[in-house]
């Protein structure tokens, strides 16, 4: 069994449909940041929708597109034109420990297969079938819907991996037999004063061998990945907590608020305060 399959089966995603939305010409669906081990997903079946994220990114969804939010980030869906829009909304609940795995994924995953591909044909039939089953009282309906929702997630992760260099992302590190434990420790204790030496000791490797293996797998350095994860965790906290910036900065390993501020701007293109304001505006 491959590493991704083991990870997905270990966390056993449990999926549900929450809403079948039929929307008019002027609408908004705001969503606040939620529990970190829960994935929200939206499938567009008619019309078009705009998806706004706290980073300032804006995406347009078309019929047949499915978007999943692995970090349960704040977001807002809204109308694009005056046409009516139909959206199926649901969630996937994973084991609490899956929040570390989910943090290694991007904030948004899209399932938009190439026309007439096997995945496209399956998805075109799966969404209406899922809607029909969710309205029925047939035996096994909950299990069936859950498995279809989980398949959305698996296909979306696979599609994302296919679009990026599979040897150059944090997920590849998490799935690596020697480096996975290192990433796990970074995620569990972002505020620890990690050094390359202390990280190498987790992998039971020399500093030089560890640094070389890490670069071979990720294309970057251990401390660069640590910085990225620390800032991602900080962004998650800004979306969910009202703690002062300095407290959050210290909790993810920054002794100086100014250095944290500069790093956050480099990563997200906005200040911590601006990020919080964007989250507030997306889900007032």
UniProtKB/Swiss-Prot annotation:
Pfam families: Cupin_6 (PF12852), HTH_18 (PF12833). Residues 177-278 form the HTH araC/xylS-type domain. Disulfide bonds join 21-89. Induction: Autoregulated. Induced in response to HOCl. SMART domains: HTH_ARAC. Oxydation of Cys-21 leads to partial activation of RclR, followed by the formation of an intramolecular disulfide bond between Cys-21 and Cys-89, which stabilizes the active form of RclR. One of its GO terms (biological process) is positive regulation of DNA-templated transcription. Residues 197-218, 245-268 bind DNA. The keyword Transcription regulation applies. Gene3D superfamilies: Homeodomain-like, Jelly Rolls. SUPFAM superfamilies: Homeodomain-like, RmlC-like cupins. Keywords: Activator, Disulfide bond, DNA-binding, Stress response, Transcription, Transcription regulation. The keyword Transcription regulation applies. Disruption phenotype: Mutants are more sensitive to HOCl treatment than wild-type cells. It comes from the Bacteria. GO terms for molecular function: DNA-binding transcription activator activity; sequence-specific DNA binding. Involved in reactive chlorine species (RCS) stress resistance. Up-regulates, in response to hypochlorous acid (HOCl), the expression of three genes essential for survival of RCS stress (rclA, rclB and rclC) and its own expression. This is RCS-specific HTH-type transcriptional activator RclR. It comes from Escherichia coli (strain K12).
